[in-house]
Amino acid sequence: MDVRFAKREDRDRVVALLRESHEAAGFTFPFQAAYADRLFQQHMLSPMACVLVTGERAQGVLMASAFDHPFGAGRIAKETVWYVTPEARGRGAIKMLDAYEAQARSVGCVSAGMASLATNDVSSLYERRGYSAVETHFMKPL
């Protein structure tokens, strides 16, 4: 399955994928399509962000952005969301990581980051790809 940069016409499909991702993650807060749409638009408009999709009719989405590390470690890329439908997982997902890393390099990033949810731990995949754990985040409802 080919990986490509999203087009504006992919918006509705990407929002649908974000809904699927939200459900798969088991989030307890409601999905907001308007918020997902804004997220897509923001990433599409920023020269320091990307929206990658896999398949002509998108079966996966990876959004990321690049920024200067707050402690001066250089420009870094950070994944915002990565979701691939169950039927499209496998080699297509790996191609998305390849494309993300290439995009990060193209905008001058010295490193790229990925996240792994507690409800869907894919850290072993990242480690096989050369990523290493650097920080663990905790959330507390307020």
Model-derived segments and spans:
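Conserved GNAT-fold acetyl-CoA-binding loop/helix
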Residues: 19-40
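Conserved beta-strand in the GNAT
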Residues: 57-66
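A short helix-loop-beta-strand connector motif used in the catalytic cores of GNAT acetyltransferases and
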Residues: 41-52
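A short, internal acetyl-CoA/4′-phosphopantetheine-binding micro-motif in the GNAT/acyltransferase core
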Residues: 80-90
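Conserved beta-strand-loop-alpha-helix junction that forms the acyl-donor binding cleft
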Residues: 112-123, 142
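A short beta-loop-alpha structural element at the N-terminal edge
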Residues: 1-16
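Conserved acetyl-CoA-binding loop-helix of GNAT-fold acetyltransferases
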Residues: 89-102
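A conserved beta-turn-beta hairpin within the catalytic core of GNAT-like acetyltransferases
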Residues: 68-79
